């Protein structure tokens, strides 16, 4: 697996841990780990001599292989496993010609490559899990600290109702916790050994095929599937889906943060730092750089996942083409997902919330944001339809006369006949109209540790 990202761009669009998991040397080592484990499994089950294991294991070191030469040879063989096995066999033969006879015994190229992909995915999930836990913890802290910080809830980008910022932060944490849940389930149940031999029947191993497969799965600590899955790619598609969903969740958070950072909104800001968020020409700017990185990654992820989904349509017992499409695509999806998440970790752990500005923005529409609260209070006396028409007319007058809605209502005899001045004033306190928000915050926070 190549990182498929330019070295100039990779640090901005991926995490260091994911780059390490997906780089060529790690991929090669995962393939060699399969070969070493296969030798151990076959020796343990009496398929190959025990004496062959040591020389094979010793030769399974990625650092001793020429990656460029393997890549060039793969263009002629159709996949990387063929030249790798050839080179590995030659290296083993230098130390023990007899042991070299048993390299890759009974396996096929796809067994090597797919199992290496499973090992890469496992490392990738571990890396994502660590960052997810950090982001969840950060947003949970914001939710607790700002559960009584009133802000504008926006629908269709317009002021709608008041809400506590803590609810928004708790929703962020919960969406990431659900993503973590998916990935943990995938790591536990969705990854699996690939081992079927030339056509998925393990025919070369005679009656020892399933016994070797079971031991090989144990050696690699991977679940043993009921049968090989060479051209049934739902496992890969499920991984792509979980990754793309996580990237999308990160993108949603990043979109909100970038909008809250707008000069005219100014409710929250990414953490400040030397040289961070500046413009090449405008020294006053504080750009949403982490949000932009997350959004860029989240924009790429769906198309990458779509390629993986398209590659599910494979022919018979070995695919000519669609399988190849997975090789550069899946690692790039892992990388950009990690990049989106890394940016969100940065935001979660350092978001600067301006509670005073949030309150100021609530007041910017001169009470119109509380129109629903007044409508429902009045509806208890005169019915919802009449209350709606009355408050709608009052809201239009408030806008036309440039007055606070509270002032207009206090002067309206149709309203004061049913609501006292004190009641009207109380209805314009944003945190008095938050519905089940506090209970929702608690429920969301309680859900964070579920697997």
From Swiss-Prot:
It comes from the Bacteria. One of its GO terms (molecular function) is lyase activity. It catalyses: 2-(carboxymethyl)-5-oxo-2,5-dihydro-2-furoate = 3-carboxy-cis,cis-muconate + H(+). Disulfide bonds: none annotated. The keyword Membrane does not apply. CDD domains: pCLME (cd01597). Keywords: Aromatic hydrocarbons catabolism, Isomerase. One of its GO terms (biological process) is 3,4-dihydroxybenzoate catabolic process. The keyword Magnesium does not apply. Its EC number is 5.5.1.2. Transmembrane segments: none annotated. InterPro entries: AdenyloSucc_lyase_C, Fumarate_lyase_CS, Fumarate_lyase_fam, Fumarate_lyase_N, L-Aspartase-like, Protocat_PcaB-like. It is an enzyme of class 5 (isomerase). Catalyzes an anti cycloisomerization. PANTHER family: ADENYLOSUCCINATE LYASE, ADENYLOSUCCINATE LYASE C-TERMINAL DOMAIN-CONTAINING PROTEIN. Belongs to the class-II fumarase/aspartase family. This is 3-carboxy-cis,cis-muconate cycloisomerase. It comes from Bradyrhizobium diazoefficiens (strain JCM 10833 / BCRC 13528 / IAM 13628 / NBRC 14792 / USDA 110).
């Amino acid at each position: 697996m190549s990182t498929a990202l330019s070295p100039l761009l990779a640090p901005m669009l991926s995490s260091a841990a994911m780059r390490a998991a997906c780089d060529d040397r790690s991929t090669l080592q995962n393939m060699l780990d399969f070969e070493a484990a296969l030798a151990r499994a076959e020796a343990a089950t009496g398929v190959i001599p025990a004496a062959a294991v040591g020389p094979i294991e010793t030769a399974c070191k990625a650092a001793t292989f020429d990656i460029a030469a393997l890549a060039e040879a793969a263009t002629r063989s159709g996949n990387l496993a063929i030249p790798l096995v050839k080179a590995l066999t030659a290296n083993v033969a230098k130390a023990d010609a007899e042991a070299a006879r048993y390299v890759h015994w009974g396996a096929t190229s796809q067994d090597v490559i797919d199992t290496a992909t499973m090992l890469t995915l496992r490392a990738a999930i571990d890396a994502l899990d660590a960052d997810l836990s950090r982001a969840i913890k950060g947003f949970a802290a914001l939710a607790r600290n700002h559960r009584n910080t009133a802000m504008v809830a926006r629908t269709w980008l317009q002021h709608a109702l008041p809400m506590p910022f803590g609810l928004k932060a708790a929703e962020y944490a919960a969406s990431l916790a659900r993503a973590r849940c998916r990935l943990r389930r995938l790591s536990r149940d969705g990854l699996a050994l690939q081992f079927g031999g030339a056509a998925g029947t393990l025919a070369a191993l005679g009656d020892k095929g399933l016994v070797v497969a079971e031991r090989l799965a144990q050696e690699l600590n991977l679940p043993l599937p009921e049968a090989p899955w060479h051209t049934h790619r739902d496992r890969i598609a499920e991984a792509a889906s979980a990754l793309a969903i996580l990237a999308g969740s990160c993108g949603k958070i990043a979109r909100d943060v970038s909008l809250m950072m707008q000069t005219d909104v100014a409710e929250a800001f990414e953490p400040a730092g030397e040289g961070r968020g500046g413009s090449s020409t405008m020294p006053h700017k504080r750009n949403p750089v982490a949000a932009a990185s997350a959004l860029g990654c989240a924009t790429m992820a769906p198309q990458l996942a779509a390629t993986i989904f398209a590659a599910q349509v494979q022919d018979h017992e070995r695919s000519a083409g669609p399988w190849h499409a997975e090789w550069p695509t899946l690692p790039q999806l892992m990388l950009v997902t990690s990049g989106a998440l890394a940016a969100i970790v940065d935001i979660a752990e350092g978001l600067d919330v301006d509670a005073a500005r949030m309150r100021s923005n609530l007041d910017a529409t001169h009470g119109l944001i509380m129109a629903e609260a007044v409508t429902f209070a009045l509806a208890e006396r005169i019915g919802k339809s009449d209350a709606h028409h009355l408050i709608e007319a009052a809201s239009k007058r408030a806008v036309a006369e440039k007055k606070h809605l509270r002032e207009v209502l206090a002067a309206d005899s149709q309203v004061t006949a049913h609501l006292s001045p004190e009641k009207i004033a109380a209805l314009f306190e944003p945190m008095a109209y938050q519905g089940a928000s506090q209970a929702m915050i608690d429920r969301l926070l309680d859900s964070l540790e579920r697997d």
